């Protein structure tokens, strides 16, 4: 029960923060310039379901969370490890719930 309350409080905080319009123009401009500089510095990310075995920290971000490089051994007797960028199920459900709440109130 406590975990549910903590997750709910976290979601409410994220939604209220993302929908707040308290950033003034100067801070918004500074933030945009910092983000532009960061994106020019960043290397290309690995899209979801693509091979990430070369760099396990290169997975792209979804709308809220970063995908995780998940490694597994495929069925069929091949002992070669396969790694792909995937979104964990709990994060997928949190994104869907947040989107539904935003659509409901926004």
Curated annotation (Swiss-Prot):
Its main location: secreted. Residues 21-41 form a propeptide. This is Toxin-like structure LSTX-D7. Disulfide bonds join 45-60, 52-69, 59-85, 71-83. GO terms for molecular function: toxin activity. The presence of a 'disulfide through disulfide knot' structurally defines this protein as a knottin. Keywords: Disulfide bond, Knottin, Secreted, Signal, Toxin. Coiled coil: none annotated. It comes from the Eukaryota. Belongs to the neurotoxin 19 (CSTX) family. 02 (D7) subfamily. Pfam families: Toxin_35. Residues 1-20 form the signal peptide. It is found in: Secreted. The lineage of its organism: Eukaryota, Metazoa, Ecdysozoa, Arthropoda, Chelicerata. Expressed by the venom gland. GO terms for cellular component: extracellular region.
């Amino acid at each position: 029960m406590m975990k549910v309350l903590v997750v709910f409080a976290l979601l409410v905080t994220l939604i209220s923060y993302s929908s707040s319009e308290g950033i003034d123009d100067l801070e918004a401009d500074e933030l945009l310039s910092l983000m532009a500089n960061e994106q020019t510095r960043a290397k290309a990310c690995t899209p979801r379901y693509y091979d990430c075995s070369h760099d396990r920290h290169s997975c792209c971000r979804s709308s809220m969370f970063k995908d995780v490089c998940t490694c597994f051994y495929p069925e069929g007797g091949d002992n070669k490890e396969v790694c792909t960028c995937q979104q964990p199920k709990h994060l997928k459900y949190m994104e869907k719930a947040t989107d539904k709440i935003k659509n409901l109130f926004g």
